[in-house]
């Protein structure tokens, strides 16, 4: 069965503590998750997909390829000075199930504990990925389907055509979109993968980076099929676009204009979550430049950077402050009519790294 119900991120219990899902995960994990054995000991990437409440390793050959019906955990181990640091991302596809999303979040906490509680945790939602996440993958694909779809490999001659959308300059993204002329636009590049023929459509206002990325993806698909496909490249303004290209899209039609979005710089806002008074209170601390000295060990702080939300967990904060930090961050997005899929990052006081310090001072 192919999942097609969009994930309601606001109803996902990310902490999962005390729920039936929590119990299910604990039983499945037993005392130690076998997949965590030996991880985080050397620089590099490890990726797991959630399958029936279990974490299943993704082959390295498939790194950077994600399905919109699944949830994943990504561990990035890197050197900072003479020590190893860890970032843990849990990625939620648009059509992943609530159980898969909850399991990914729960297992992320488990992996964090296994690595000593110091890693920085990131919640990544499809189409709203952070630059730090996208930078991990030279090739980044979002494809339709998921573990319930079977992932059956088919021969090129039996291949069901699909349309891939390539957009963005610095960190170009590749995502599968509906196979229709209405999916095209002048500002981006597209690949129509028909099995033995791969059509590259370059929008009239697409960037050189997008064209290069599209060509790179076409070459990767061609190599995967041992050089059998023929690759045809053309621009929106060409007069000799193959008739078969339009036929596969349901017929020739008007191409949408390039979608321009003006860059916006949001004012940083620092909030404090504290129960020092006897009851849990969420209050604004400051706006504009945020000094690290404003972050106190006794409390939890939520930092709104516009395109990302950070929860900073003080080393002496109370159990209740720690437990509710994520839910306050998600509720903050809802209350302020912000996109609920905005990346949320969890940072422990003793687990901060240079990238976090840079964000504060920027």
Curated annotation (Swiss-Prot):
Q: Which GO terms describe its cellular component?
A: actin cytoskeleton; cytoplasm; phagocytic vesicle
**Gelsolin-like repeat locations:** 53-102, 172-212, 280-323
Domain of life the protein comes from: Eukaryota
InterPro entries attached to this UniProt entry: ADF-H/Gelsolin-like_dom_sf, Gelsolin-like_dom, Villin/Gelsolin
Annotated residues that bind a 1,2-diacyl-sn-glycero-3-phospho-(1D-myo-inositol-4,5-bisphosphate) are located at 162-170
The Gene Ontology terms for molecular function here are: actin filament binding; actin filament severing activity; actin monomer binding; calcium ion binding; calcium-dependent protein binding; phosphatidylinositol-4,5-bisphosphate binding
- GO process annotations (BP): actin filament bundle assembly; actin filament fragmentation; actin filament severing; actin polymerization or depolymerization; barbed-end actin filament capping
Q: Quick check: keyword Calcium in the entry?
A: yes
Question: Does the entry feature the keyword Nucleus, yes or no?
Answer: no
The cross-references to Pfam families, in alphabetical order and at most eight, read: Gelsolin
Query: What keywords would UniProt list here?
Result: Actin capping, Actin-binding, Calcium, Repeat
Q: What else is known?
A: Severin changes its conformation upon binding of Ca(2+) and then interacts with F-actin.
**The protein's role, per its UniProt record:** Severin blocks the ends of F-actin and causes the fragmentation and depolymerization of actin filaments in a Ca(2+) dependent manner.
Can you tell me which family this protein belongs to?
Answer: Belongs to the villin/gelsolin family.
Put simply, this protein is called Severin
Report the source organism. Answer: Dictyostelium discoideum (Social amoeba)
């Amino acid at each position: 069965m192919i999942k097609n119900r969009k994930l309601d991120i606001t109803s996902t219990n990310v902490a999962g503590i005390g729920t039936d899902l929590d119990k299910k995960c604990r039983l499945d994990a037993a005392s130690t998750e076998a997949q965590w054995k030996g991880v985080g000991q050397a620089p590099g990437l490890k990726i797991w997909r959630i399958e029936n409440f279990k974490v299943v390793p993704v082959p390295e050959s498939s790194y950077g390829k994600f399905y919109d019906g699944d949830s994943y955990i990504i561990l990035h181990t890197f050197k900072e000075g003479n020590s190893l640091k860890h970032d843990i991302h849990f990625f939620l596809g648009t059509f992943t199930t609530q159980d898969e999303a909850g399991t990914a979040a729960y297992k992320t906490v488990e992996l964090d504990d296994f690595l000593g509680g110091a890693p920085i945790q990131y919640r990544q939602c499809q189409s709203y990925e952070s630059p730090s996440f996208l930078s991990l993958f030279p090739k980044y694909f979002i494809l339709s389907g998921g573990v319930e779809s079977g992932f059956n490999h088919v021969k090129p001659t039996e291949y069901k055509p699909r349309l891939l959308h390539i957009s963005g300059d610095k960190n170009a993204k590749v995502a599968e979109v509906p196979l229709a002329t209405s999916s095209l636009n002048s500002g981006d590049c597209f690949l129509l993968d028909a099995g033995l023929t791969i059509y590259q459509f370059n929008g009239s206002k697409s960037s050189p980076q997008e064209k290069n990325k599209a060509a790179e993806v076409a070459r990767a698909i061609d190599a995967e099929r041992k050089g059998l496909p023929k690759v045809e490249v053309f621009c929106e303004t060409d007069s000799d676009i193959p008739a078969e290209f339009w036929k596969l899209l349901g017929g020739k039609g008007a191409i949408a204009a390039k979608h321009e979005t003006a860059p916006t710089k949001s004012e940083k806002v620092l909030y404090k979550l504290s129960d020092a008074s006897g009851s849990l209170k969420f209050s604004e601390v400051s706006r504009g430049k945020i000094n690290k000295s404003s972050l106190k060990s006794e409390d939890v702080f939520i930092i709104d950077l516009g395109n990302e939300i950070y929860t900073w967990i003080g080393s002496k904060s109370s159990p209740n402050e720690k437990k509710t930090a994520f839910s306050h961050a998600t509720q903050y997005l809802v209350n302020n009519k912000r996109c609920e899929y905005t990346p949320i990052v969890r940072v422990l006081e003793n687990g901060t790294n240079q990238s976090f310090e840079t964000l504060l001072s920027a």
